Structure formats: structure tokens, C-alpha cells
Design a protein with these regions (language model features):
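Catalytic cores of alpha/beta
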Residues: 105-106, 279-284, 326-344, 387-401
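Catalytic beta/alpha-barrel core
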Residues: 118-121, 147, 168-170, 208-209, ...
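Short beta->alpha transition motifs characteristic of CBS
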Residues: 118-123, 166, 170, 177-193, ...
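Glycine-rich phosphate-binding active-site loops on the catalytic face of alpha/beta enzymes
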Residues: 114-126, 289-301, 343-358, 386-419
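Alpha/beta catalytic cores of nucleotide-metabolism and tRNA/nucleoside-modifying enzymes
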Residues: 8, 12-68, 148-149, 210, ...
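Active-site-adjacent beta->alpha loops and helix N-cap segments on the catalytic face
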Residues: 124-132, 238-258, 276-278, 297-317, ...
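Short beta-strand/loop segments at the ligand-binding rim of alpha/beta enzyme cores
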Residues: 87-92, 141-145, 261-269, 311-326, ...
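Bateman/CBS regulatory modules and CBS-like beta-alpha motifs in cytosolic regions of diverse proteins
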Residues: 76-88, 95-97, 126-164, 171-173, ...
């Protein structure tokens, strides 16, 4: 079924019969308030309205119409695209917010089949280290394993293993040749922290594997020798990689994990569009980041467009995402600058005040519909406004390829910050990147207010708040994917691509929205995927 956006049911067309265009088409944008039209065969000057008469919609304004289905929810394919070059097993992304995504969240998202975007409210070195931690968290074969020299001390080995949360380190000489290995077992009863590793490491009968060893072959070697780490060496004895039993077990534990060609978890990271953004981009790329996100509040500004073009020219092979936009023109402008995905959403987030502070924005469903038209074949990321799993289904049905979530994930174990108790319940903090405190910590450039040091000189576009503690993010993702599967089953779509093209929406009234939620009862026990 060909489409430029999802179709709307007859009831919606009837409800909007007074409009002259469907809700996905823009009204004339002539800011001068005049234009040419043909009256009785002659051109005449006429005044054009500056107010678009078509109704802009958000998720609560519509429902998807059930359709004939031959697909069971458990059999649907939830894979989609994050960018032109990055696939997802589930179309869910964690937002680049400093109360949502650091390395713990990014690791959990990738293991579930999604991806996390590391926030940029940190130093360049720390953000690059966060990328490195995600990439090192698991691997088919670690291509550049952390190493030590035989002259290093037990103290240095302990510090290194604690820092990277690893249980062993290969020991190499000045030429990179493997001379031994040190593990937690070697150090468990070592009391002399200044003892050189040459006296503590295992050097005799080292078990190694040649370059080209498969993971299945490596597993057999590890099991045969009852060891946990297998150095990979070339014919000269030079260390070329490391295979661990932990990574092999994780491959079975997380079969849907989103990994790169080397078996490492995928991760994206945010940069700005001014200042040292190019230095930050280089550091992230050197650390192995899979995608760069130029993260701004207004992606259809010349500064952002220029920065996007600069990054694309400097790094033609990196997967590049930019935003945020809310119109077809904004999406088209970013695509013309070479992005691999467009991020959509101006003001829909629960912690965002952009629309009331500035008076600017587009309700998220309409923003997605229009941006998908402008982006063409380039994936669209729907950023913000997701309260329930059904909202994610609607965003994907509107044409988005993935959905970005912030506040929904802020209360999970993997989000930055500690949980706190209030009136007997556990909470975690969440704040918009446009909140006053976040802007003071480094996100002011996202709102084009960089350089302002005094809080009194900042104009925030977000708030700080708290959300209930939700436990592991895997529990939240399980419910989100379960709702997505059920939604796909109801509308008869076996794939995300079919969901993006086939279903119909119907516009609903406030009475219809009330009817959609639990009503006429007192909830005595909340469901894991629904709360008021």
C-alpha cells in the first residue's frame, strides 16, 4: 500500500470536513500574509490566513482501527531501523538526558535489542570513556584488550581491574608479545601490593588460540582447560585479541542484543552544534561510538544545519542523526545535509516546557506524520510524548522507525542517580535538558543560550521532578515490547514496516479518551504497564 503517511478512518475525514486539506498537509506559509490566486480566470492578490486551519493531533487524539489479522503477537517481527546503517531488534531508544542515559542504561538498552544515546552533560573525556565502557562490556572477541607490563605492580593491576570491572589482564612486553596473564585468582591472597606482576602472573603453559578462532571453537578450548580467558595471538606471539567465557555466556543470555560487526554492543552519543562539538565528535568516534546525535531543541536552524553539514563532511562514514524538528521542511533540510536519521519532537516531553514558554511546537503525532514525508527513506526517531506502550505503537504507525523515551526510563535501576525514599515510596529524579540545573551543567547550548553563567540570565525550557522507582529497565522494555506486539496483532501487521504503512487511525473525542482508560472503578492494584 503506497502512502505518504498513515490513512485516517472515514470518521476523521467527516469530523474535519470543514478543512481544505488533510491534517498531514501544511497550510500556506507566506509570512507576508498575501499571495496570488486565480479568480474567474484572472490572477488577483488576496490575503492568506496566518493560522493553519487543519487540526494538529497528538497520541491521545487518535486510536488505531483494528484490522483482520493472521499474525499472532508472539510471531511478529519488531526489528526496525535506528539509522540508515544501524538496525534495531526492538524500536526503542533511551534519550540523551543526564537523568536517563549513561553507560549502564546504554548497555541494558543494547542487550535488549535497542540502543541508548549517551548525554553530553559531561566532559569530552568522560563521555568517550562511557562509550568505551559500553563497547568493552561484551564482545565476540575483544580486539584491543586492556594490557599491563610485567614490571607493573599488583596495586596497579587491582586498580585497573576495579576500574574496568574485569577479572583478568594479559601481560605483554614492549613489542606487544604475550608473556603472561594475571587474574583475580592470582591476586586473591596477595598482600604485597608493590610486588611486580612478573612474580605473580601465570606465565607457564599459557593457553592461547590462533587468529581466526571462532567463538564455538573458543568455547570448547575454555571448557577443556577450565579457564575463563583465552588470549588470541598471531604466529609471532603478538597479542591480537581476547575471548572470555563471560562474553560467550552473555551471547546466550541476551540473544537479541544489538551488536556491531565485532560482537560489541552498539551505542550512540550526543554532541551539540556549537563550541567544541567537532572535538567531541572526534573523541567519540575514536572511542568507537556507533552513531553521533546532534542534539538541539531546534534542528531547523541555520547553526544546526551548518554543524550537521560540517560533521558529515569531516566524517563521511559515521552514522549521523540530527534534530529536533517538527515539520516536513525541517526534516527535508536535515536530510539534504546528509543525516542518516531525523529526530522529531518540539516540546512533547513530560519534562519539557518549550511550548508554554515559547508558544512554539507541533503536537507529536502530526509532527511525525509531516516529518516522515520530508525525510523520505531516511528513518525518523519519534522523541518524546510516550506515556504508555500504545503511544509507541501510534508513533510507529505514524511512520517513525523508532521511539525515544526519557521519563519512562528515568525511574529504572540503570538510570543515573540514586533512588530516594519519600513517604514510604522510592523515587528517582528526572529533569529536562532544558531545566535550569541541566542548563547550568552544560546543556544551555541545546537551547542556544551557551555562554550565560548566571542562572538569572538563563531562560529554562524544562523542569525537574521525580518519578516512581521502576526496577530494572528490562522490566519496562518487556512491557513496552509486549504492548507493541499486541498492537501489531490487533491491526494485523507482522512487521514494523507493515505497521508504518497499513493501519488506519480514527480521531476520538474526550469521551472516547475517557472510555479508553479504566473508568467507573477504583484501582486497587496497579498493573506493571499502567499507572495514573
Amino acid at each position: 500500500m503506497s502512502r505518504s503517511g498513515p490513512t485516517f478512518a472515514r470518521g476523521l475525514h467527516f469530523a474535519m470536513a470543514t478543512t481544505t486539506r488533510p491534517p498531514t498537509q501544511p497550510a500556506p506559509r507566506d509570512r507576508r500574509g498575501s499571495g496570488l490566486s486565480r479568480v474567474n480566470g484572472a490572477e488577483a492578490q488576496e490575503s492568506e490566513p496566518r493560522v493553519r486551519v487543519d487540526v494538529a493531533l497528538t497520541f491521545d487524539d487518535v486510536l488505531l482501527v483494528p484490522g483482520h489479522s493472521v499474525t499472532h503477537p508472539r510471531d511478529v517481527d519488531t526489528s526496525s531501523r535506528f539509522t540508515r546503517g544501524i538496525q534495531l531488534r526492538i524500536p526503542l531508544v533511551s534519550a540523551a538526558m543526564d537523568t536517563v542515559t549513561e553507560s549502564d542504561m546504554a548497555i541494558a538498552m543494547a542487550r535488549a535489542g535497542g540502543i541508548g544515546v549517551l548525554h553530553k552533560n559531561m566532559s569530552i573525556d568522560r563521555q568517550a570513556a562511557e562509550v568505551d565502557r559500553v563497547k568493552r562490556s561484551e564482545s565476540g572477541m575483544i580486539l584491543n584488550p586492556i594490557t599491563l607490563r610485567s614490571g607493573d605492580t599488583v596495586r596497579e593491576a587491582n586498580a585497573l581491574m576495579n576500574r574496568f570491572r574485569i577479572s583478568g589482564v594479559p601481560i605483554v612486553d614492549e613489542d606487544g608479545k604475550l608473556v603472561g596473564i594475571i587474574t583475580n585468582r592470582d591476586l586473591q591472597f596477595e598482600r604485597n601490593l608493590d610486588r611486580p606482576l612478573r612474580e605473580a602472573m601465570t606465565r607457564d603453559r599459557l593457553v592461547t588460540a590462533p587468529v581466526g578462532t571462532t567463538l564455538d571453537e573458543a568455547e570448547q578450548i575454555l571448557a577443556r582447560h577450565r579457564i575463563e580467558k583465552l588470549p588470541v595471538v598471531d604466529e609471532t606471539g603478538t597479542l591480537r585479541g581476547l575471548i572470555t567465557v563471560k562474553d560467550i555466556h552473555k551471547r546466550r543470555q541476551y540473544p537479541d542484543a544489538n551488536k556491531d560487526q565485532y560482537g560489541r554492543l552498539r551505542v550512540a552519543a550526543a554532541i551539540g552544534s556549537t563550541g567544541d562539538f567537532m572535538v567531541r565528535a572526534k573523541a567519540l568516534i575514536d572511542a568507537g561510538v556507533d552513531a553521533i546525535v546532534i542534539d538541539t531543541a531546534h534542528g531547523h536552524s541555520e547553526a544546526v544545519l551548518a554543524a550537521t553539514a560540517d560533521v558529515r563532511q569531516r566524517y563521511p562514514d559515521v552514522q549521523l542523526i540530527a534534530g529536533n524538528v517538527a515539520t516536513r521542511e525541517g526534516a527535508r533540510a536535515l536530510v539534504e545535509r546528509g543525516v542518516d536519521a531525523v529526530k522529531v519532537g518540539v516540546g512533547p516531553g513530560s519534562i519539557c516546557t518549550t511550548r508554554v514558554v515559547t508558544g512554539v511546537g507541533v503536537p507529536q503525532l502530526t509532527a511525525i506524520l509531516e516529518s516522515v514525508e520530508g525525510a523520505g527513506d531516511v528513518p525518523v526517531i519519534a522523541d518524546g510524548g510516550i506515556k504508555y506502550s500504545g503511544d509507541a505503537v501510534k508513533a510507529l504507525a505514524a511512520g517513525a522507525s523508532s521511539v525515544m523515551m526519557g521519563s519512562m526510563l528515568a525511574g529504572t535501576e540503570e538510570s543515573p542517580g540514586e533512588a530516594f525514599l519519600l513517604e514510604g515510596r522510592r523515587f528517582k529524579m528526572v529533569r529536562g535538558m532544558g531545566s535550569l540545573s541541566a542548563m547550568q551543567d552544560g546543556s544551555a547550548d541545546r537551547y542556544f543560550q551557551e555562554g550565560e553563567l548566571s542562572p538569572r540570565k538563563l531562560v529554562p525550557e524544562g523542569i525537574e521532578g521525580r518519578v516512581p522507582y521502576k526496577g530494572p529497565v528490562s522490566d519496562v522494555l518487556f512491557q513496552m515490547v509486549g504492548g507493541l506486539r499486541s498492537g501489531m496483532g490487533y491491526v494485523g501487521c507482522a512487521t514494523i514496516d507493515a505497521l508504518r504503512s497499513d493501519p488506519q487511525f480514527v480521531r476520538i473525542t474526550m469521551a472516547g479518551l475517557r472510555e479508553s482508560h479504566p473508568h467507573d472503578v477504583t484501582i486497587t492494584r496497579e498493573a506493571p504497564n499502567y499507572s495514573l
